[in-house]
UniProtKB/Swiss-Prot annotation:
Reported modifications of this chain: Contains 4 disulfide bonds.
Tissue and organ distribution: Expressed by the venom gland.
Protein name, entry field: Beta-toxin Cn9
Domain notes from UniProt: Has the structural arrangement of an alpha-helix connected to antiparallel beta-sheets by disulfide bonds (CS-alpha/beta).
Subcellular location(s) per record: Secreted
GO MF assignments: ion channel inhibitor activity; sodium channel regulator activity; toxin activity
Keywords for the protein's UniProt record, in alphabetical order: Disulfide bond, Ion channel impairing toxin, Neurotoxin, Secreted, Toxin, Voltage-gated sodium channel impairing toxin
Function of the protein: Beta toxins bind voltage-independently at site-4 of sodium channels (Nav) and shift the voltage of activation toward more negative potentials thereby affecting sodium channel activation and promoting spontaneous and repetitive firing.
PROSITE patterns recorded: LCN_CSAB (PS51863)
Domain LCN-type CS-alpha/beta: 2-14
Length: 14
């Protein structure tokens, strides 16, 4: 997972 906004439960957009 990286900085940004969450799109999934396992990661983010960025």
């Amino acid at each position: 997972k990286k900085d940004g906004y969450p799109i999934q439960e396992n990661g983010c957009k960025y």
